[in-house]
Amino acid sequence: MLKHDFASHIENLKSVTKPKSADLGRHLWTCAIDAHHYWLKYQVPHAYAQNEQDFLHELQFYEDIQHKNVNWLLPFKIVDADTVSQLQQHEGKILILPDTEDWFDRSIAKQNLKDIYETVFSALKALTALHELGWIHGDIKREHFRKFEQQLYLIDFEKTRLISSPDSIVDATPRYMAPELFHGASKSIQSDLYAFGIVLYEWLSQMRLQANSYHDWAVLHCQNLDIQLPDSVQVFYPLLSGLLQKQQKNRFSNAFEAINCLKVHSNL
């Protein structure tokens, strides 16, 4: 991915850190290296314990999973922060990833059903592969499905945990939270699938769900969510219904079931 002495080739280093993130010690930069664009992700050591723990967990996940020969992991590099000349005052590690596009960024109006099917199928295949390796992603959202060189990749593994030992603390984005998480249940394969269902529903319907508070999100997910799709993509309703069941026992139990549903009902 990068030359060994890449640090001396960094150009146009630009901070894209949100103020709220900076307050918690999290920093993001974009840069160019040999005419290719990259993201640099960094956590200030000892600034905020939870953020640091999550970041270190993500670094370890990258180190561990690279030996599994998966096709949904971006090429990456982890380096000491002080090897980057512009960041020599920083301690700790930096995660470097290539710049990517949003996998679900395209308007469905410009795509035929076969293109939409392939987009959804690729995302479900990646989720299936992650789960089959024994992991829950734990932070499924639209921006964590990326396109690089026309292929799908997953990113942001800070909340990724082994299925056998999920987090006891539910730390999730309310927009994507399965109903059971609002009641204190641990994350699971099925909460990943519910979150993916929300990603898919917003993309297929071309609208964003709206809520003003954590309580409002809880009411929406636990009581009020009603799937309404344009006629042009009604073929995907059975898939969404299985992903977005409010009762966990009625939801798909794994991503393989979702793929089977997609195949059966798409007629493509």
Placement of each model-derived feature along the sequence:
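Conserved short submotifs of the Hanks-type protein kinase catalytic core
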Residues: 86-103
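Conserved catalytic-loop aspartate of Hanks-type protein kinases
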Residues: 192
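Catalytic-loop of the protein kinase fold
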Residues: 131-147
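Conserved activation segment of eukaryotic-like protein kinases, specifically the C-terminal portion
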Residues: 167-181
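Activation segment signature within eukaryotic-like protein kinase domains
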Residues: 119-120
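ATP-binding glycine-rich loop module of kinase domains
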Residues: 24-60
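Conserved HxN/HPN-centered segment at the entrance to the catalytic loop
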Residues: 66-85
